[in-house]
Amino acid sequence: MKILVIGSGGREHALAWKVTHNKEVSRVYVAPGNAGTAIDPDMVNVPITAVDDLVKFAQDEQIHLTIVGPEAPLSQGVVDAFRKAGLKIFGPTKAAAQLESSKDFAKAFMVRHNIPTAAYATFTDAKLAHDYVTQQGAPIVIKADGLAAGKGVVVAMTLDEAHAAIDAMLADNKLGAAGARVVIEEFLQGEEASFMVMVDGKNILALATSQDHKRLLDADLGPNTGGMGAYSPAPVVTPTIHAKVMREIIKPTVEGMAKDGIPYTGFLYAGLMISPNGDVKTLEFNCRMGDPETQPIMMRLKSDLVALMEHAVDGTLDRAETEWDRRFALGVVMASANYPDTPRLGDEIVGLPKQLTDAHVFHAGTVLNNGKVVTSGGRVLCVTALGETVKFAQQQAYKIVDEIKFNGAQFRTDIGYRAVKG
């Protein structure tokens, strides 16, 4: 059986790596992949990204199942195209992916279906947005409506920051079409968590909880990024909160999408804010697994990922069960110089470990160049390790990080600090 994974990041490397554990899988193709998937003897990179080319490849190679990693192909309708061609694919349709591709769509959906979220207003006119922010005060959150690779959210702690974010998106067009409409939300306080599930249109299977670290620098300082590290499980999601999230957020979302005539299949990721008194609100939806959360989650998943996806595609997730490694997994992202601004590319990476036990280095922004692994993107690697405690997993991951070198490498030294402290 052949499997195709679409994408080139650390998330896709982790998904492909987990798929190779299935003995019936003869080949895992990754399109377009990265240096990590190129080096792995169980994977083959395919240099294609266009939807039509992916469909043709899946037909020609008789791909049994396709897994979509990133948001962009989903919003381009890759699932619709594969289904039309009679091909098995795991992910939401273009219409369902609006939960992520349009913040305004997601907010209106949540209000309509009574799903707890922050109060908000949407603007296309810069003057009206400025007036609203002046009236509301800071701190306040400015979000680009469209997909902006994790960089479309500004948590403005001052009015000056809020006005600058509005100007960047609406007046200066810094994010292009993604920022032509902005959603302005109330600032929520508490602890964030990532809550991911698999959905088959009706049935829901919860995956392990996790917590991401969005800011570039230690102690959650510096600019927002796509994520600088993550760990699983997230102790902040207690059994009580888990049940509450399923009852008040996940179930109403899946039922609401079906009610709206847009049944949802695929991974669904709710970004949560958990207040000190146990209130939970939805910050955002993503229509795919998180990156870097996927890496620690896949390290802990003991069940067969292919079998779970087969159930999801066939509408039988109610028959599926998951088994998890009881240990913690923690991943540290190593990023290029200048990230999250325009990253420096082409630096050789040395010190990559050959063999690891209870740990794995997942590649993201890497390519093979004359047999050398070099940087090719903002987030370069996610060094992920298992441990009996968060502290031990953290120590194991950082031991490996310390061995890996490339010019200008950036990484946080405190991934998992909340759980270690807690």
Each language-model region and where it sits:
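Solvent-exposed alpha-helices and their adjacent loops that cap or buttress functional pockets
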Residues: 21, 37-39, 90, 112-114, ...
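Active-site "cap" helix and flanking loop/linker of ATP-utilizing ligase/carboxylase catalytic domains
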Residues: 246-268, 286-356, 369
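Generic C-terminus detector
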Residues: 369-370, 375-422
